[in-house]
């Protein structure tokens, strides 16, 4: 049971430790939360210290952290959060403040109808035009990647792996022509 008030600092320290593991032969690290002495990790990643770390969040502290130490942003919104269109300008400013190009910074957001009732959610995941429109909206906002949360699909009746894969294939077939380069 960790204190949620320290999770951001723990994440930052953990990212620093991981990057050191991926780069150095032997790691000595003495942080507030993590300490290691003469630890080695093998094999090293082929990217040599450059495994991209994507971080999620939309609150101000999270956005600052992502812009400072992240390699990609997994955007998300919860009920009561401002729409992503309102968060994006601030995030792009933070990227620039940290010497990162907002036009090329990787950003991902789930293809989701948001917090709406079950009937509208079911329509969303069955209406390929709605899905394509949402994906195009995210692309036009600058998102480089999207994902699909399979939990709502499961909750909407796509219970077997075959049914879920069939629905995901339909979604892919609808999205691919619109979003491929």
Annotated model-derived regions:
Residues 1-181:
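Active-site-adjacent structural elements that line small-molecule/cofactor binding pockets in enzymes
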């Amino acid at each position: 049971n960790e204190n949620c008030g320290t999770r951001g600092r723990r994440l930052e320290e953990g990212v620093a430790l991981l990057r050191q593991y991926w780069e150095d032969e032997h790691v000595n690290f003495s942080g507030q939360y993590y300490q290691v002495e003469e630890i080695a990790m093998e094999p090293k990643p082929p990217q040599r210290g450059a495994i991209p770390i994507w971080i999620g969040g939309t609150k101000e502290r999270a956005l600052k952290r992502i812009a400072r130490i992240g390699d990609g942003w997994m955007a998300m919104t919860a009920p009561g959060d401002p729409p992503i269109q309102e968060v994006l300008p601030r995030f792009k400013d933070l990227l620039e403040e940290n010497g990162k190009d907002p036009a090329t910074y990787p950003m991902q957001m789930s293809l989701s109808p948001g917090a709406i009732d079950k009937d509208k959610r079911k329509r969303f995941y069955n209406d390929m035009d709605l899905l394509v429109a949402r994906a195009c909206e995210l692309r036009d906002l600058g998102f480089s990647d999207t994902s699909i949360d399979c939990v709502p699909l499961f909750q909407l009746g796509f219970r077997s792996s075959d049914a879920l894969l069939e629905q995901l294939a339909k979604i892919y077939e609808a999205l691919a022509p619109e979003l491929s380069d």
